[in-house]
Curated annotation (Swiss-Prot):
Amino-acid racemase able to utilize a broad range of substrates. Highest activity is observed with L-homoserine and D-homoserine. Has tenfold lower activity against L-methionine, L-leucine, L-valine and L-histidine. Has low activity with L-norvaline, L-asparagine, D-methionine, L-aminobutyric acid, L-isoleucine, L-serine, L-norleucine, L-alanine, L-glutamine, LL-diaminopimelic acid and L-phenylalanine. Has no activity against ten L-amino acids (Thr, Glu, Asp, Arg, Lys, Tyr, Trp, Orn, Cit and Aad). It holds the Pfam family Asp_Glu_race. Its EC number is 5.1.1.10. The keyword Isomerase applies. It comes from Escherichia coli (strain K12). InterPro entries: Asp/Glu/hydantoin_racemase, Asp/Glu_race, Asp/Glu_racemase_AS_1, Asp/Glu_racemase_AS_2, Asp_race. PANTHER family: ASPARTATE-GLUTAMATE RACEMASE FAMILY (PTHR21198:SF7), GLUTAMATE RACEMASE (PTHR21198). The gene is ygeA. Substrate binds at M10, Q52, T83, N84, T85, T198, E199. This is Broad specificity amino-acid racemase YgeA. Optimum temperature is 37 degrees Celsius.
Amino acid sequence: MKTIGLLGGMSWESTIPYYRLINEGIKQRLGGLHSAQVLLHSVDFHEIEECQRRGEWDKTGDILAEAALGLQRAGAEGIVLCTNTMHKVADAIESRCTLPFLHIADATGRAITGAGMTRVALLGTRYTMEQDFYRGRLTEQFSINCLIPEADERAKINQIIFEELCLGQFTEASRAYCAQVIARLAEQGAQGVIFGCTEIGLLVPEERSVLPVFDTAAIHAEDAVAFMLS
């Protein structure tokens, strides 16, 4: 079994499922008392979020690249960045850390393609929904077209993520709002929905979505397990 290095804490609420899902995956594959060989570097999300708001992406890239190097020195054999949004600086991490980097959009793209879909809704932070680092990769590498919410909906979802979910607050009102947005995007032709923020899967259960759900945290964790046992 390879040792996986997790870059977490963005937010820590969604890092917990990564640890659980990876361990469950190893147990299912190997049985008995087997558990995952995991190293975790959990950053202070306050600093990361401030950099996001200020547009200081180079600084966040430096922080995460240094964290990845620390995991490499500690014995990690691959890197999993436990957040969708911070894949905006994936290149900065990969340019300085020589370990295999398991990109969350690639794992998600393979899952969508495997389900025979080419047109999906995307919910996430405004950075993930509006910028090209995530949607563009899905389009270029997997020919997947992402439908995103309207501007006011994007602002509301971003507010829910940062002011509620990242603080461990999960309300029925926000759950219903996200389900309503998903239903509207289904009417526009979306075949499935990407929970492109690792916290959204903590808010909206699959049964509340009219579309098949691609929970990126779960998909990414499965990809990590496959890598660890390869």
